[in-house]
Structures are given as structure tokens and as C-alpha cells.
Regions:
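Conserved catalytic/binding loops enriched for acidic/polar residues
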Residues: 13-231
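Active-site recognition of the HExxH zinc-binding catalytic motif
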Residues: 1-8
Length: 231
């Protein structure tokens, strides 16, 4: 996308992963009480990508260029597409309720609840069989880290709803809304979901799993991908 001049659209994942220029999280699901990665990522370009190609490279018909380009944007708006890029999504103080990195779902709060269920199942299943024979247990701890923090990006997405805004890059004469605050109901649901992640049952590693993580072996030092610790 960058090669042909397209920017990231970090609001695309809320609309059926409409762009390859978003960063969605791998899509996991529970099938018959087992974690499935069958649909981890989409294939091909999304509907928003088709909009950007049409806007940038289409042959203009026998009409004014401005009229044609405005019609492309209006059709995109009617289809529910929204374009929000890096400066609004990456910033730690970002307030857009739809623009996030490595998130999924039409609703950040509901997706957080869903990913926590998958995380719980993954932790229940975690065992020494998650590493190869003859690998040190120190590796097992590092394998556990991304599972333990599986919900971290969805937490970032959800917390932005609290005091958050839904806004667009609007020009004078445009038909899309300029901005509106997240409703109090949306914010309350987001707050409750965030507080749930602070429960001991979520934060605490089950005691039977702690036995899998002895002090680090010689030569296997901690990195930024490891838990912080002194043993």
C-alpha cells in the first residue's frame, strides 16, 4: 500500500477488516471449546483499499474531477468506511474510539470480553508441551508471555472509549459528521470491562502454572519480550 501512495487506515478493522493498511490482531476463536486459528488473517485486499485505488487511480469519466472524487467518498461513507491514520491511532493520548493498532471487532469492549475468554482457555491448556524436548524451561516462560498479555492491545483500544470521540477528517461542504463524544453507556461498558482486567483471577498466573517457570537458565537472559523479574 505504501508503495502506491496509501496511508494506514487504523479504523478499518471495525468494518470487517476493510483494509490491508490496518494492523489487525490475529483472529482467534473458540470452536468446540478449543482455540482455532483457522481464520487468523484475511486474504486479499479489503473494500477500503478498493476505495483508495478508485480515488487515486481511476480514469475520470466525462464529469468534473471534484464531482467524481466526492462521489467516491460519499459511496465509501454510505458503506460505513472511515479513514483515521497514524497520528490519531498511535498516540498514547489518542481519543478516537475506532482507530487502534492490533485490535479486532466492531466494538472494542465486546472484543475485549471475547479475547479474555480465549486467553483463559489458552492459559488452561498451557503446559510443558508448549516447548520442544531438550529446550530449557526458560524458553517456556517466554512462550507464555504473549499468551498472558494476549489482551493487551484490546485493552488499549477499549480504554480509548472512556472520554473518547468519534470523528472524521471532514472538509467544508462534506456530508460526514465532524465529531461526537462516546455515549455515557459506551463509556460505562468500557470502564467495567477495563476494571475486569484488574481482577485477581485475570492478573494472577494460576499456581499450577507457576511451577513451570523456574529461575532463568544460564545463557537465557531476559529480553524486552520477557516478564520483568530478578530471578
Amino acid at each position: 500500500g505504501h508503495t502506491i501512495g496509501f496511508a494506514h487506515n487504523f479504523a478499518a478493522s471495525v468494518n470487517d477488516n476493510a483494509s490491508v493498511m490496518d494492523y489487525p490482531h490475529p483472529q482467534f476463536s473458540l470452536e468446540n471449546d478449543e482455540i482455532s486459528i483457522a481464520n487468523a488473517y484475511d486474504t486479499g485486499i479489503g473494500e477500503w483499499d478498493k476505495v483508495t485505488v478508485k480515488y487515486s487511480y481511476a480514469d475520470i469519466p466525462n464529469t468534473s474531477e471534484r464531482k467524481f472524487l466526492n462521489s467516491v467518498l460519499e459511496q465509501a461513507q454510505e458503506a460505513g468506511h472511515q479513514f483515521i491514520s497514524d497520528s490519531d491511532a498511535r498516540a498514547q493520548g489518542g481519543a478516537h474510539i475506532n482507530a487502534h493498532l492490533w485490535d479486532n471487532g466492531k466494538n472494542a469492549t465486546e472484543e475485549l470480553k471475547r479475547i479474555l475468554k480465549i486467553r483463559k482457555k489458552g492459559i488452561e491448556n498451557f503446559s510443558v508441551d508448549n516447548i520442544r524436548t531438550n529446550e530449557p524451561y526458560s524458553v517456556l516462560e517466554d512462550v507464555f508471555v504473549p499468551l498472558y498479555f494476549l489482551h493487551r492491545y484490546q485493552v488499549e483500544a477499549t480504554v480509548k472509549i472512556i472520554g473518547g470521540l468519534d470523528y472524521n477528517y471532514v472538509v467544508k461542504g462534506g456530508k460526514d459528521k465532524i465529531w461526537e463524544s462516546a455515549t455515557s453507556k459506551m463509556q460505562e461498558k468500557a470502564l467495567n470491562a477495563i476494571l475486569k482486567t484488574l481482577d485477581a483471577e485475570i492478573i494472577a498466573i494460576p499456581k499450577e502454572k507457576l511451577e513451570l517457570f523456574p529461575p532463568r537458565a544460564f545463557g537465557y537472559n531476559r529480553s524486552r519480550e520477557s516478564f520483568k523479574g530478578n530471578t
